[in-house]
């Protein structure tokens, strides 16, 4: 892996705190002049770290670069897991379909060590937990590769091992999803709603392992 410029890391961390803001608002929050921020953004857009558009957005390249640093920091501070909390909500019915596909099922068995129940438990995160979910967006996780069945191509899925109460499972983060950003999907060898007696609206806390 090539060396990462320390100045670049500082710039990306600063910009991550103002994502979604206009240049004027971001410059004020970062205590920079508009001209200075425009100059920085031009350079980072040229290098592929920042997306084009009126609002400041990091590209996947920018997020991946921050993810490398975040992983090192988590290891340095011996942070092995995070806890997210929220309420159980009904899904769109997609989880049952995707978890029943042989391509995903076999990959999950190989990568995570269990056969997934054909369905997911959906949790709508509390606002503080949504912030911490961004850590997961930046970390590599466990890759469940995409595949094609000859008729359709299915995208890759990022996973993290997790524990809900006493049940070991994982959260899955598909490349393509119709869920809002404050919803996570949990898979396990069992139907979690049934074995844990969960209903819509029930509060839950899930521990997610970062390694």
UniProtKB/Swiss-Prot annotation:
Question: Per the record, what are the reactions this protein catalyses?
Answer: riboflavin + CTP = CDP + FMN + H(+)
Q: Which UniProt keywords apply?
A: Flavoprotein, FMN, Kinase, Magnesium, Metal-binding, Nucleotide-binding, Transferase
Q: Name one GO molecular function term.
A: nucleotide binding
The source's domain of life comes to Archaea
> Its pathway?
Cofactor biosynthesis; FMN biosynthesis; FMN from riboflavin (CTP route): step 1/1
Q: Where is this region: H-T-H motif-like?
A: 1-81
Locate the region Riboflavin kinase. 82-211
The cofactors required by this protein are: Mg(2+)
Q: Which GO terms describe its biological process?
A: FMN biosynthetic process; riboflavin biosynthetic process
Q: Where does Mg(2+) bind?
A: 120, 122
Give me the comment on cofactor binding: Binds 1 Mg(2+) ion per subunit.
Q: Which residues bind CDP?
A: 91-96, 190-193
**Pfam families annotated for this entry?**
CTP-dep_RFKase
Residues binding FMN: 177, 185
Enzyme nomenclature, EC number: 2.7.1.161
Q: Which InterPro entries match?
A: RibK_CTP-dep, Riboflavin_kinase_archaeal, Riboflavin_kinase_CTP-dep, Riboflavin_kinase_dom_sf, WH-like_DNA-bd_sf, WH_DNA-bd_sf
Q: What does this protein do?
A: Catalyzes the CTP-dependent phosphorylation of riboflavin (vitamin B2) to form flavin mononucleotide (FMN).
Q: Which PANTHER family did the record assign?
A: RIBOFLAVIN KINASE
Family membership: Belongs to the archaeal riboflavin kinase family.
Its name, as the record gives it, is Riboflavin kinase
Q: Which organism is it from?
A: Pyrobaculum islandicum (strain DSM 4184 / JCM 9189 / GEO3)
Q: State the organism's lineage.
A: Archaea, Thermoproteota, Thermoprotei, Thermoproteales, Thermoproteaceae
What's the name of its gene?
Answer: ribK
């Amino acid at each position: 892996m090539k060396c990462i410029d320390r100045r670049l890391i500082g710039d990306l961390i600063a910009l991550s705190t103002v994502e979604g803001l206009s240049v004027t608002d971001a410059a004020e929050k970062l205590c920079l002049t508009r001209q200075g921020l425009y100059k920085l953004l031009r350079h980072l857009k040229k290098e592929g770290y920042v997306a084009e558009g009126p609002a400041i957005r990091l590209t996947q390249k920018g997020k991946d670069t921050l993810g490398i640093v975040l992983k090192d920091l988590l290891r340095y501070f011996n942070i092995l897991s995070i806890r997210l909390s929220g309420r159980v909500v009904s899904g769109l019915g997609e989880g049952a379909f995707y978890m029943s596909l042989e391509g995903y099922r076999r990959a999950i068995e190989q990568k995570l060590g269990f056969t997934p129940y054909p369905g997911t438990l959906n949790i709508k995160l509390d606002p503080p937990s949504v912030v911490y979910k961004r850590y997961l967006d930046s970390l590599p996780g466990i890759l469940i590769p995409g595949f094609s069945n000859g008729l359709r191509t299915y995208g890759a899925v990022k996973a993290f091992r997790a524990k809900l109460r006493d049940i070991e499972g994982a959260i899955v983060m598909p490349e393509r999803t119709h869920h809002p950003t404050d919803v996570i999907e949990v898979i396990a060898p069992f139907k979690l709603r049934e074995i844990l007696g969960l209903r819509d609206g029930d509060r839950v806390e899930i521990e997610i392992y970062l390694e």
